Regions:
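Short, Gly/Pro- and small/polar-rich lid/capping loops
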Residues: 1-5
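N-terminal strand-loop-strand
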Residues: 6-52, 80
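Terminal low-complexity/charged segments
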Residues: 7-11, 18-31, 90-97, 102, ...
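Active-site segment of metal-dependent pyrophosphate-handling enzymes
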Residues: 19-21, 65-69, 73-170, 174, ...
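Structured surface interface patches that mediate subunit assembly and partner/cofactor docking
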Residues: 202, 236-241, 254-257
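Charge-enriched amphipathic alpha-helical scaffolds
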Residues: 225-247
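Long, intrinsically disordered, low-complexity Ser/Thr/Pro-rich regulatory/activation regions
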Residues: 243-273
């Protein structure tokens, strides 16, 4: 009987098909009270001239997580931001070139740290505001089925992405299945606001912020306004009373009544996941 080493030496990798694997990175930020997403404009086929989520093929010497960190730095110029694996998109026909499986990640990037530019394979890069992501039965179905791709096929709401200059694109205008990926990411973030500290990942300075800044982030992700009093009471109950935010003193140099500044104390047990 041959040893494992002998078996591996004679193993024929051509016995099985080898799908390509990519990482797609949804780089979100909050600016001007809106949730914004970094997209790149493709300068190559397929989907030449279409806007797309930045990403790239997985290298043979890196893990998916390492590839995601690399691409966030290449596209947005940042490191050490909150990132998490979103979902694996594996529809057989999702890429017209060949069989490609995409591992999607979302990244929460403070706007003040964002330094984006068009990289390899892109003519342009821009921040788009994100609107039109619907809720309702489709969300319940995706959770029950544990299959966002199937649930999104039944989604009647359309995704609307708008540049500050006013140019808008819909989900149908995006490359590949990136509209589905974006919808899935927005819903993931909305669902996690109440039981994780995800919103704090968007703060420009977690050591010195106001509750108004934090509320604006929540509203941007949720896509609607929140009652100011209820929000403050919830944050004070869930965070200040638990010692996860602490007062730093009143804001200086502000017009009108100064706001209280807070500092976020990261709790590894809750953090972002």
């Amino acid at each position: 009987m041959q040893s494992e080493q002998q078996y591996l030496k004679t193993y024929d990798p051509s016995l099985f098909d080898h799908p390509s694997v990519t990482v797609d990175i949804l780089i979100f930020t909050v600016a001007d009270k809106k949730l914004r997403l970094l997209l790149i404009k493709r300068n190559t086929y397929p989907f030449l001239g279409k806007w797309a989520v930045p990403g790239g093929f997985l290298r043979m010497d890196e893990s998916a997580d390492e590839a995601a960190v690399r691409r966030v730095y290449e596209e947005a110029g940042v490191k050490n931001v909150h990132m998490e694996q979103l979902y694996t998109f594996s529809a057989v026909d999702r890429d017209p070139r060949t069989r490609v499986i995409s591992i999607a990640y979302l990244a929460a990037v403070p706007f003040g740290r964002l330094q984006y530019s068009a990289g390899v394979g892109a003519d342009d890069a821009a921040l788009f505001s994100v609107e039109g992501v619907t809720e309702g039965e489709v969300i319940k179905e995706s959770i029950a089925d544990a299959d966002p791709e199937k649930a999104l096929d039944r989604d009647s709401g359309d995704l609307i992405l708008t540049m500050p200059e006013g140019m808008a694109v819909t989900g149908a205008d995006l490359a590949f299945d990136h509209a589905e990926i974006i919808r899935t990411a927005v819903r993931r973030m909305r669902g996690k606001l109440n039981y994780t500290d995800l919103a704090f990942g968007f703060l420009n300075d977690p050591s010195s912020f106001t509750l108004t800044e934090l509320r604006i982030i929540h509203e941007a992700i949720l896509g609607h306004k929140l009652d100011i009093g209820n929000f403050r009471r919830t944050i004070k109950r869930d965070y200040e009373a638990a010692g996860r935010i602490v007062e730093r003193g009143l804001e200086k140099g502000s017009v009108g009544r100064p706001a209280m500044l807070y500092s976020y104390i990261r709790d590894p047990a809750r953090a972002f996941t």
